[in-house]
Amino acid sequence: MNIIKSITLLLTLLIVILMTVCSPRESASEVAKKYIDKMNSGDYETAYSLLSKDSKKKISIENLEEFQNILVSTKRIISYKIGKEKIIKKYKHDGKEYKNVVKLEETFNIKNLLYKKDDSLKVNRYFVVENNKYKLLLYESFKKEFGINSMDLAQLKLNDFGLKYFKEVDLILKKAIAINPTDSKLYYAQACNYMNFDGFPGYSDTTYNALDSINKSLKYLDKNDSDYKKNASNIYNLKGVILMFHKRFDEAQQYLNKSLYFNKDNEDPKYNLNTIKKHLN
């Protein structure tokens, strides 16, 4: 009987030891905090070491540094809070399915430099275990946030009018598109900026570039977005405007009418259709 008890106790101890050995020393919450703190302090090498293997295939250390530079140019983090850990048995990230993923919601209190107001930002983070350590699945949220912050920075740059700023915005948007080449809103912003080059010597081809960008914006437009119709209306209106620049008025009218089809309350295509009508008369 004592032998059986001893064996049972030994097995229990072995299980406890194995569980202790197999469990990551740092929790997902601790890794999340370390990532935020290292990014804020500029220790990108350590921050990068916290990414999952798959995330590192899509994101470089230079990308992290560039992300942070854009972030601090558009927002100031006042404080942040990390929510409770939640286990997700199956989670799909960047086309790949992961098991037993830890989800965390991070809440940031920020000062938005573009809109000059305090705001709250919520970000979901997902962690997987690699070599007995929690690693951050970053690519999906990274590319989305990179695009949003890049467009904010572009808007800040455009507070000043001039070729110098248009060229800076062009570079900002091209880098963001390289990170997220299927973001409809980035292509829309790029098309808008290309139109700013009109009239400057040596940039006569930019309106053609704008047409290419607006077509890509249409191609990658998310039909599941709650603002799909509004976004579609704005894109079709801009395409109509670009075609007006090229004096392709019949085509322009078609796209401006499409813009109204998606949003009959959009005043811009109404104005542009009226402009064409006056021009043709």
Predicted features and spans:
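Short solvent-exposed beta->alpha transition segments
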Residues: 45-101, 106-108
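Exposed beta-sheet edge and beta->alpha loop/turn motif
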Residues: 88-159, 249
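Hydrophobic/aromatic packing residues within the alpha-helices of TPR/SEL1-like helical repeat arrays
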Residues: 166, 173, 211-214, 221, ...
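Flexible helix-coil transition and linker loops at the boundaries of alpha-helical arrays
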Residues: 174-182, 216-232
